[in-house]
Amino acid sequence: MNKGKYIFLDVDGVLNHHETYKKKHVNSLYPDLDPECLALFSKLVHSIDYVHIVLSSSWRLIESDMDRLEAAFKEFGIPKWIDITPYLEYEQGKTRGKEINQWLKENHVRKDQIIILDDNTDMADLKDRLIQTDFMNGGFKEVHLKKALHMLKGNHMTKETKEIFEALEAANNTLDNLYKAL
């Protein structure tokens, strides 16, 4: 299972955000997921050959959440995840990063083959593979898509590149806040 690229996907803060719950897409089977975030995620998945999704979200623990997510994926043409990360108990020092590391070890996947889409930072030694989204600021956005594509295509994340993406994200957040103020 070690060929290709892998996206470790959190749901809350990536495929939804605080505005999603205000809007509650009433005509949808998945009112707690944002259609714009799903469309961008679909674009990401279809832009990379041999990409696999591994669900690292707490949604993996609740069957009804996984059913809703699967329905949304189907509607947006996103392939179903190939696996879920193991659940570590708190006594084992549970963090999302440790769960992902455990999955990598069990499946013989290298760190340079992955990205992590998450709004949390508890990634242990995987922080350089994290594309951090923001639950309070729109979830998965175009800037995250561009950064994910950059990393999944094997491009090295230099200090300058990192600064460019940070500046783009800050500018994007400023624009979003200006639009909200109108």
Where in this protein do the model-derived segments appear?
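C-terminal cap/substrate-recognition subdomain and adjoining C-terminal extension
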Residues: D67-F165
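Active-site neighborhood of HAD-like aspartate-dependent phosphohydrolases
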Residues: N2-S47
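Substrate-recognition element of Asp-dependent hydrolases with the DxDx(T/V) motif
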Residues: I48-D67
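Short, basic/hydrophobic alpha-helical segments
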Residues: L38-D49, Q102-R110
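Short coil/turn segments at beta-strand junctions that form active-site/ligand-binding loops
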Residues: K3-K5, D49-V51, K111-Q113
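Short His-Asn-centered micro-motif
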Residues: L9, S56-I62, L117-D119
